[in-house]
Amino acid sequence: MSDFSEELKGPVTDDEEVETSVLSGAGMHFPWLQTYVETVAIGGKRRKDFAQTTSACLSFIQEALLKHQWQQAAEYMYSYFQTLEDSDSYKRQAAPEIIWKLGSEILFYHPKSNMESFNTFANRMKNIGVMNYLKISLQHALYLLHHGMLKDAKRNLSEAETWRHGENTSSREILINLIQAYKGLLQYYTWSEKKMELSKLDKDDYAYNAVAQDVFNHSWKTSANISALIKIPGVWDPFVKSYVEMLEFYGDRDGAQEVLTNYAYDEKFPSNPNAHIYLYNFLKRQKAPRSKLISVLKILYQIVPSHKLMLEFHTLLRKSEKEEHRKLGLEVLFGVLDFAGCTKNITAWKYLAKYLKNILMGNHLAWVQEEWNSRKNWWPGFHFSYFWAKSDWKEDTALACEKAFVAGLLLGKGCRYFRYILKQDHQILGKKIKRMKRSVKKYSIVNPRL
C-alpha cells in the first residue's frame, strides 16, 4: 500500500518496464497498466493523447467502483495519478480532489486495505492538494471516527483547525466551522461519559466535585466549538441535539428553546423535519401548552404527513375544544393511511375507526365526505380488496377487524373486505364483529338514513 501512495509523488518515466507490478506490505497488488490505459484501440489505431487516455482511465475506475471491483479499480487508480501532470492547469488543479475521492473510496472498501494505508494516502493527498487540505482532513477524521479512533480523529481535527494557507473565503470559513464543530462532537462524547460517571457518584463522595468540574470544562469546550456552526444556515442535526442537551443539563431552558426555535423557523435554514421534531420533544418535556405543541406538529404534518408523531398530533387535535382542530384530526388520520408504509399500522386504524364513529354520531358527515371524496377511487383497491381481507385476517385478526369497521363505514355493508371479515368464525372476536355490524348499519356514510 505504501507504493500506492508513493505514486503520488510523481509520474513514472517512459523507460520503466510496462510489466512492472507492485505488491505492497498490505498485500494489495497494483500491476502497471500505463501502456494498456494509454492504448485505446479503435479500428486498430493507438491513441496516446494524454487527455483521452486519462479520461478513459477515469471511466474504467468509475465502472469498477460501480461493480464493486475494488482490486481492478485500484489498478486503474495507480495509472490515473498521471493527471497530476496534466498540461491543462484547470484539470491539474482539480486532479487532487478527484484522486482523493476515488482513492479513499477504494481504500475504504478494498478487502486488503488497512488503517495505515488509508492514513498514508490521506496525508499525502493533503500535501499535494493544499487547496483541499481542510476538506480532506475532515473526511480523514470521519474515517477515523468510523473505526473508533477518537483520539486520532481529534488530533487530526486540531491540526486542521490551526492550518493556514491561501485566502480566507466563505467556503473555507464554513469548513473551519465544521471542523471545529466535529471537534466539539468528540468533546460532547467525552462530556457524556463524564456525565454518566457523575450520575453514579454521591454528592458527598470526595471525587464528586472533581468530576463535576471536569464535566463543566468539557461542556464549555463543546459549546464554543458548536455554537458558531449552528448559526450558519444548514442541516446540523447532531450538533444541535448535542448543544441543546448540554444547555438543558445546566438548566438553560430559555437558551435551548431559542436555539431550537431558530433552527426550526429561521427562513434562511433549509426545510428540515427533524428541526420541528426536536422542538416538539423539547416543548413536550417542558410540559408546554397544547396550543404550542399543535402549532409545531402542524408544520411537521405539512412536511411529513406520514411521520409517527402524526398519531400524537391527532390525539392533541382530538382533545382540542376548537372545531377546526377536531376536523384537522380526521384529515391527519386519513393522511397517515395514504402511505404504503402505514397500511399495517393498527394504532392508526383503531384511531380512525373510533374517530369516524364519533364524528358521524356528532353529525359531521360533511367532514368525512370531504376526506373520502378524494380517496374513494383508490382506497378500496389500496386498502379494502378481497385479497387484503384474506391476508390481513391471516396475519393479524385485530388489524383486520379495525379495517373492516372503517371499510364498512366508508363503503357500506356491501364492501367485500367488510363481508369477508363478517363471515369469519372467531370465538374471541365474535361479539366485536356483531357490534361492528350494527354500527355499520347505523352510521355508514352510504346509508340513506344519514
From Swiss-Prot:
GO terms for molecular function: DNA binding. Pfam families: TAF1_subA. It is found in: Nucleus, Nucleolus. One of its GO terms (biological process) is transcription by RNA polymerase II. InterPro entries: RNA_pol_I_TAF1A/TAFI48_chr, SL1/TIF-IB_Component, TAF1A. The keyword Mitochondrion does not apply. One of its GO terms (cellular component) is nucleoplasm. Keywords: DNA-binding, Nucleus, Transcription, Transcription regulation. PANTHER family: TATA BOX-BINDING PROTEIN ASSOCIATED FACTOR RNA POLYMERASE I SUBUNIT A, TATA BOX-BINDING PROTEIN-ASSOCIATED FACTOR RNA POLYMERASE I SUBUNIT A. Component of the transcription factor SL1/TIF-IB complex, which is involved in the assembly of the PIC (pre-initiation complex) during RNA polymerase I-dependent transcription. The rate of PIC formation probably is primarily dependent on the rate of association of SL1/TIF-IB with the rDNA promoter. SL1/TIF-IB is involved in stabilization of nucleolar transcription factor 1/UBTF on rDNA. Formation of SL1/TIF-IB excludes the association of TBP with TFIID subunits. Component of the transcription factor SL1/TIF-IB complex, composed of TBP and at least TAF1A, TAF1B, TAF1C and TAF1D. In the complex interacts directly with TBP, TAF1A and TAF1B. Interaction of the SL1/TIF-IB subunits with TBP excludes interaction of TBP with the transcription factor IID (TFIID) subunits. Interacts with UBFT. Interacts with CEBPA (isoform 1 and isoform 4). Part of Pol I pre-initiation complex (PIC), in which Pol I core assembles with RRN3 and promoter-bound UTBF and SL1/TIF-IB complex. This is TATA box-binding protein-associated factor RNA polymerase I subunit A. It comes from Homo sapiens.
